[in-house]
């Protein structure tokens, strides 16, 4: 089946946007691509466009639907990896496919954001579905206006992060994950394997040069959890040393689970998001 969606960005909900922006500028070794607001929805954001997707830091900044979602997440989970957003080049075709696959989606809704530095405006159309369709995980689909290209987050330091390798979703139902990500969103299931030491199944859905790693276990919560993120570095030694020198709490570099990879864990400056840095030398 032709893929209906790619991965557009991940959302990290934060309490203090200025602090979070400083932390992620340091972590990524990049300057923000965009620092804006959504006046109609009561939120403000900072965006970092990487090679494959972008990272959005999102905070409540007024009254509105999005502000309510952010506030509820902060009350229930604290700062966290709060949302996974998919992209389509044809929003009408996506709506038709989703509805035919049993995903009850909204009609496309126009949206816009304003950059506080340049005054530029970006425009898009969003398609929403009830969070129960994703077993509690906040997600939606977006088609960006062709004239609203997001600039790349400029590299400011050596050992900068260049992309997202994967995000981790915890679930109690592998079959529900295959239906949602595979059948309804049209994302390719690249690998499914049983992992006895975890007591469950591991699924890898591939899009946008990254994976959604779904860990399905009977011990998982009833609702799915968007849990952690792995960031790509071309030179993990350089990235690791840069972070250590800046006072970021970072583990030693070690061999990754995938042959040929080396990883380290970042333990601070992540807004509570479990974060791994990975270099693939295979």
What kind of region is each of these model predictions?
Residues 51-86, 91-110:
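Active-site-adjacent scaffolding segments
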Residues 56, 92-160, 203-208, 212-213, ...:
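Vicinal oxygen chelate
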Residues 1-17, 79-86, 140-176, 226-229:
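N-terminal beta-strand motif that seeds the catalytic metal site of vicinal oxygen chelate
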Residues 199-245:
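Intrinsically disordered, low-complexity segments enriched in Gly and acidic/Ser/Thr residues
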Residues 2-3, 16, 47-49, 73-79, ...:
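Short, low-complexity cationic-aromatic patches
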Residues 12-61, 100-102, 106-122, 161-162, ...:
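Core segments of cupin and vicinal oxygen chelate
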Residues 33-34, 65-69, 149-153, 214:
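A short, acidic/glycine-rich surface segment
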């Amino acid at each position: 089946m032709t893929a209906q969606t790619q991965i557009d960005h991940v959302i990290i909900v934060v309490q203090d946007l200025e602090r979070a922006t400083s932390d992620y500028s340091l972590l990524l070794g990049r300057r923000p691509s965009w620092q804006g607001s959504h006046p109609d929805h009561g939120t403000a954001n900072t965006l970092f466009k990487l090679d494959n997707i972008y990272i959005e830091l999102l905070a409540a900044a007024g009254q509105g639907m999005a502000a309510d979602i952010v506030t509820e997440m902060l009350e229930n989970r604290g700062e966290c990896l709060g949302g996974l957003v998919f992209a389509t080049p044809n929003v009408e075709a996506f709506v038709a496919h989703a509805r035919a696959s049993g995903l009850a989606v909204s009609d496309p809704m126009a949206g816009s954001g304003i950059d506080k530095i340049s005054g530029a405006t970006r425009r898009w159309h969003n398609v929403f579905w009830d969070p129960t369709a994703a077993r509690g995980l906040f997600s939606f689909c977006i088609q960006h206006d062709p004239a609203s290209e997001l600039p790349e987050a400029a590299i400011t330091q050596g050992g900068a992060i260049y992309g997202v390798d994967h995000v981790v979703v915890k679930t109690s139902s592998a079959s529900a994950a295959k239906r949602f990500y595979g059948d309804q969103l049209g994302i390719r299931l690249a690998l499914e394997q049983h992992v006895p030491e975890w007591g469950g199944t591991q699924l890898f859905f591939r899009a946008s040069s990254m994976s959604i790693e779904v860990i399905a276990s009977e011990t998982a919560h009833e609702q799915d959890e968007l849990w952690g993120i792995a960031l790509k570095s071309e030179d993990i030694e350089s990235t690791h040393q840069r972070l250590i020198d800046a006072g970021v709490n970072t583990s030693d570099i070690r061999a990754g689970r995938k042959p040929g990879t080396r990883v380290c864990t970042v333990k601070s400056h992540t807004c509570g998001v479990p974060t791994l840095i990975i270099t693939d030398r295979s």
